[in-house]
């Protein structure tokens, strides 16, 4: 953490300055000297404390050090509590990396990936600080075989390259508390972009912008910690003498960041083209866009080397849908087009899937007939059914996040809801949650809606299912990956049999239940209802969405 050469130079400079001040007490001070000797001794000593570390500051002034240490402990009590506590493994390594973004427009997506990973990391420390076109990442690591294999390294590949700091890896046992002070100051006080700390998956406290400004004002903290955590090409200190030195040497590039950054170019094109095709064909599942002829005719999109870019673009499109309400999805699919005209479909919504859809008129007739049959031809019951369904799908009611239909086989449950899954597109299926299936819920993260068909679960998972049906955040196991965080995602449950959560009191406010009957007349229909029929149905019964 500490730069020994820098510290020695700073210490000698400091002693020289102190000697000069003591030997010339009667000299008329300049305005700069006045600013150094004004007010309290704490500020006076710090002003000429130079470009040191907390360890060197402790040697210069215990009073100054103690005051600053107290302030740091207040701002980063969770951080220091972990790195100096009993739960951290001394044999773990401290790793510091820099993500150099290919384009600044990719920054927010990269930060989302890092936040998601931080929340899913169930052990250790993970933190990042963003500075425009690059992002610093720190974490502790088992460092097996002297290498880091954390999965976030692969997750950020579509957004840029990861560079090491160039400094030898240090282990936790080598750090003193003053070293951790330097780390915290450098990454979470001096940096003013997006910052985050995660400790065992929980978000930790970081200094607010006001606290950072107060820190800088109180301690003149512009050059406190060395830039030793930066890469050789990616130094973050705005040091004018370095720029001028390069210019004096005849360099044609006077910029501080000498490493040439990549333009968005290739990835930007792939992302834009892939998302445009997804809007045009609206395939289900999203990954099936690779089977569309227009996609396969594009040499760049079909290049195996670009597989990671394609996957990132598909995930990004899915996340776009996850954040949309039903109204926003309706607007996406009906831009400048009245889809009630069944002679043609919106060119941005061709709904390619493995099944064949009926036309809009035929779809509306059969779906309406099914609802009348299941609701005993009672229009009020149909309105209630559709209203409750929209409330769940749009997350309108707190703690109400599940919609269940129980019926004998051939009741039309899947016939009806396939229409909705084709509309929302980004959906996941939950499996049978028992001791033989540890990854039953691995499709839950980053989805617009979840389907649980014929649910079955062990009692040990009751609390997790309560959180799922109540819209609370929870984590799930994912095969060959870290545990994943799941935000509120509506759950559709279709079953032929009674399940414990249908009658347990704890679930009564978390789930809406309907009982349907067998619908034998559906066997005469070979085609599935068109997804856009759902919006026609809502309009027919004046349901607000």
Curated annotation (Swiss-Prot):
The endonuclease active site can probably bind other divalent cations. Its main location: host cell. Residues 12-277 form the PV NS1-Nuc domain. SUPFAM superfamilies: P-loop containing nucleoside triphosphate hydrolases (SSF52540). It is found in: Host nucleus. A divalent metal cation binds at residues 130, 134, 136. This is Initiator protein NS1. It comes from Diatraea saccharalis densovirus.
């Amino acid at each position: 953490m500490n730069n020994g050469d820098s510290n020695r130079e700073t210490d000698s400079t400091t002693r020289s300055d102190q000697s000069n001040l003591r030997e010339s007490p009667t000299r008329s001070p300049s305005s700069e000297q006045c600013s150094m000797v004004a007010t309290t001794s704490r500020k006076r000593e710090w002003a000429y404390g130079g470009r040191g570390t907390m360890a060197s500051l402790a040697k210069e002034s215990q009073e100054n050090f103690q005051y600053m240490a107290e302030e740091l402990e207040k701002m980063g009590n969770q951080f220091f509590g972990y790195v100096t506590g009993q739960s951290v493994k001394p044999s773990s390594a401290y790793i510091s990396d820099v993500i150099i973004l290919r384009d600044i427009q990719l920054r927010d997506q990269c930060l989302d990936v890092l936040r998601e990973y931080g929340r899913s990391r169930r052990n250790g420390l993970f933190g990042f600080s963003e500075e425009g076109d690059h992002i610093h990442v720190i974490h502790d690591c088992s460092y097996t075989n002297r290498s880091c294999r954390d999965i976030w390294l692969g997750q950020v590949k579509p957004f840029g390259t990861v560079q090491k700091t160039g400094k030898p890896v240090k282990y936790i046992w080598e750090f003193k508390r003053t070293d951790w002070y330097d780390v915290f100051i450098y990454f979470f006080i001096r940096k003013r972009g997006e910052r985050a700390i995660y400790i065992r998956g929980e978000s930790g406290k970081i200094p607010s912008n006001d606290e950072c400004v107060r820190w800088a004002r109180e301690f003149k903290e512009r050059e406190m910690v060395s830039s030793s955590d930066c890469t050789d090409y990616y130094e973050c200190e705005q040091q004018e003498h370095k720029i001028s030195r390069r210019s004096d040497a005849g360099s044609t590039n006077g910029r501080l960041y000498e490493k040439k950054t990549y333009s968005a170019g290739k990835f930007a094109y792939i992302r834009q083209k892939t998302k445009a095709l997804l809007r045009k064909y609206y395939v289900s599942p999203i990954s099936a866009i690779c089977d569309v002829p227009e996609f396969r005719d594009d040499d760049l999109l079909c290049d195996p080397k670009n597989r990671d870019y394609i996957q990132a673009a598909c995930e990004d499109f899915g996340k776009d849908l996850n954040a949309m309400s039903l109204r926003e999805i309706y607007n996406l699919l009906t831009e400048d087009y009245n889809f009630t005209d069944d002679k043609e479909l919106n060119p941005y919504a061709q709904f390619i899937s493995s099944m064949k859809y009926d036309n809009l008129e035929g779809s509306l007739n059969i779906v309406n007939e099914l609802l009348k049959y299941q609701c005993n031809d009672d229009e009020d019951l149909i309105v209630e059914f559709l209203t409750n369904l929209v409330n769940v799908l749009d997350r309108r009611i707190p703690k109400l996040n599940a919609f269940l239909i129980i019926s004998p086989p051939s009741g039309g449950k899947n016939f009806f809801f396939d229409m909705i899954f084709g509309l929302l597109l980004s959906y996941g299926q939950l499996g049978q949650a028992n001791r033989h299936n540890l990854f039953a819920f691995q499709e839950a993260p980053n989805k617009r809606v979840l389907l649980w068909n014929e649910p079955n679960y062990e009692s040990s998972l009751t609390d997790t299912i309560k959180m799922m049906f109540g819209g609370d955040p929870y984590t799930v196991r994912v095969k060959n990956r870290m545990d994943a965080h799941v935000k509120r995602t509506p759950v559709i449950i279709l079953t032929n049999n009674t399940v414990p959560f249908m009658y347990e009191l704890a679930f009564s406010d978390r789930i809406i239940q309907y009982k349907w009957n067998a619908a034998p007349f559906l066997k005469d229909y070979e085609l599935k209802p068109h997804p856009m029929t759902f919006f026609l149905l809502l309009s027919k019964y004046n349901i607000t969405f």
